[in-house]
A protein has these predicted regions:
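SF2 helicase/translocase NTPase motor core
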Residues: 3-47, 54, 67-72, 76-189, ...
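Extended, hydrophobic alpha-helical segments in both membrane/secreted and soluble proteins
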Residues: 59, 65-67, 71, 75, ...
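Inter-lobe coupling linker of SF2 helicases/translocases
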Residues: 128-129, 135, 139-160, 172-195, ...
Length: 345
């Protein structure tokens, strides 16, 4: 009240106090600390989470529905209720900055990004007796950085109360060594029965039933032994408490009575290549065909790597002149080295 000098200031002070009291008594406390207005359907995962202890949710909504907002809402609510004091997001490297921006700008967290490029700078801010993983309360981590043996156990030792795993379909054991390492990391996190865990993906089922069961097993060990083809009604009801999946079509048809997503209009336009651009494309096509021809006789994995490299080159060349220039400059990397990079991707 020290700064109140007139009736206008007093009115603002009273309004602020009233809103603060209303917020603390409301069933959802986080609404006063976010800078985004959630859609009604985006509150469903939050309401589901408030019925669980610990919170274990697989959010498998369609692309564009807002899984990031849904997960961050849960994190903000648990934080404001005092149920968590530390938070980690595990995601692919290319999503780290996007997650940090969303948490900072829309949900008033102060995250740090932890990956191979930032860890050295972060370590300079940490007292000697602590680690990066224990010092910063809100972290966005590259899952491919943390899954490495030298980082994994230190992270697990100091893992926070809530962990969000984005693109979790990339952390199922089916699909090679890299996926298996990610799965082992998330499995170790899930083994703590007190930990809150949010799993996000738009593609929970890749067509491999065992991989889907392993994914469900991260929510509850018992789910892993359930065969989806023989689920009982009781099992479906129990799983439904932990699993939400909506398509854009589902939401557009059943929520809020107005179109939520813009209608997609498809129109094809012809594009005439200049003589120089056509010559470039034909040269790139000949090169790509030679790459595929030279892959004959190689091991299956290396052959597929070269096919993808050839297709990526052609798509880049057809995209734009600048994209073509960038792709052709990368051709200075030997194919063997490029294959190694693709395996790490």
């Amino acid at each position: 009240a020290h700064g109140i000098k007139d009736a206008g200031s007093m009115h603002l002070f009273w309004q602020a106090a009233r809103l603060l009291l209303r917020e603390n008594s409301a069933p959802i406390r986080s609404m006063g600390r976010i800078s985004v207005r959630p859609r009604t359907y985006q509150l469903v995962p939050l309401l589901m989470a408030l019925r669980l202890d610990p919170v274990r949710l697989l959010i498998a909504d369609d692309v564009g529905v807002g899984k990031t907002i849904e997960a961050a809402l849960i994190a903000r609510e648990l934080w404001d209720r005092g149920e968590i004091r530390r938070l980690a997001v595990l995601c692919p490297p290319y999503l780290c900055d996007q997650w940090a921006k969303e948490l900072s700008e829309k949900f008033h967290f102060q995250p740090v990004v932890v990956n191979s490029a930032t860890v050295g700078l972060l370590e300079r801010e940490v007292p000697h007796e602590r680690s990066v993983y224990s010092h910063f309360p809100v972290q966005v981590l590259s899952i491919d950085f943390v899954k490495r043996e030298r980082n994994k156990y230190l992270f697990l030792q100091h893992a926070p109360e809530l962990v969000i795993v984005d693109e979790v379909h990339g952390a199922t054991p089916a699909g090679g060594r890299e996926r298996h390492l990610r799965y082992e990391l998330v499995r170790a996190l899930a083994d703590d029965p007190r930990r809150h865990l949010l799993l996000l993906t738009a593609t929970p089922h890749s067509g491999v039933p065992q991989a889907f069961q392993r994914l469900l097993g991260l929510l509850d060990r018992e789910f892993e032994s359930w065969d989806p083809s023989t689920w009982t009604e009781e099992q479906r009801i129990r799983l439904a408490r932990h699993f939400v999946q909506r398509t854009r079509k589902d939401i557009a048809a059943t929520w809020e009575g107005a179109p939520l997503f813009p209608e997609r209009e498809v129109r094809y336009e012809g594009y005439h290549l200049s003589p120089e651009y056509r010559a470039l494309y034909e040269a790139a096509f000949r090169y790509a065909r030679e790459v595929v021809r030279r892959s004959e006789g190689l091991a299956e994995v290396r052959r597929r790597m070269r096919w993808w490299a050839a297709l990526t080159l052609l798509r880049s060349v057809m995209s734009s002149p600048r994209s073509a220039q960038s792709a052709l400059e990368r051709r200075g990397v030997p194919l063997e080295e490029e294959e190694a990079l693709l395996e790490l991707a």
